[in-house]
Amino acid sequence: MYKRQLLACALIPIWYKSLAVGDGAGQISSDRATAYYAVAIAVMTVVSALIGPVCGAIADHMRIKKAIFSTTVVVGVSACILNGFTLTWVLFLVIYVLTKIFYNASLVFYDSMLVDVTTKDRMDEVSSYGYAWGYLGSCVPFLVSLAAYICGPDMLGYISNRLSMIIGFAVTGIWWFVVTIPLFKSYKQVNYVSDAADKDIHKNFENDAFIRDNIKEKNKTNKNPGVLRLIADAFAQIFGTIKKIATKDKKVGLFLVAFFLYIDGVGTIIDNCINIGTDLKLDSVGQVVFLLFTQIVACIGSLIFGRLSQTYKTTTLLYVCIAGYFAVCLYALTLHDLIGFGIMAFGVGCFQGSLQALSRSYFSKII
């Protein structure tokens, strides 16, 4: 699934600052704009964290996952396109937060598909390849958006900054939808909860064709629960899972706590890097170029760590990625020029996709 983060990192903060900062009616200072942006990201994170478990529980029901995944993608794409038409920074933040919430919700369903498309021994590799090609694919709409933003006013005259942002958001949303079409068409849910009362999760299919056939047969005979029953079952499953983690699967609980903490750090760096660079008065075009470079490095890094996962334990590689990210954070404290920003971008790229991919595959294996 296509990663939208490059546009979010680069052009969105720049456009947001142009709407928010100034002496006009309703406009504010640069520092306050950065603070409000960070608050909006925090709200998005909290809401996503609250609805994530519900989405995950619902995703376990048979024949439900693809339909709800498709809904979150369509709503997210629509909100993404609407971002370009906002006239005030407040409205922009509201729609942007909604876009991110539905994007994150779609990722819950997307990530849960990993156990349906591969076997346990290949999860690290498949997950890493998914992130690698996602980061590389994100360069396509970003380059189109960047060309419209930088070159449009000079080369074509009639393309204003506002129109270039409309083009950028539209291209991003359309690209997000188009590259998800193969998943809409080809994905088939194999693992599911057929009855939330007994929590019978059919997931240990590996290469057993007999189990696969039995699951497909059950899919033909069982009916989907109603909406209210589905939500009630989701909460029942969440509470049951929490109880199980607290009493039996403490390894899963420990990982979830750790993941929540370190992945929030990853998200903070991704979402605020351009804001920080702008506040330091760094050249905006240079920052964008380095972020494009980050995507390419992230693609290569994900592929390398995917290969390394065949030799080393996933936990060992996770420790390496977390330590690397921590070192990047320490280095960022000394940031004062564009070259330093480029070095930081390279460091982020080395570990960003790898940490996300390995976290996804590791969690899929331990559950």
What are these regions (language model features)?
Residues 127-149:
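Glycine-rich segments within core transmembrane alpha-helices of 12-TM secondary carriers
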Residues 189-256:
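Juxtamembrane intracellular "pre-TM" segments in multi-pass secondary transporters
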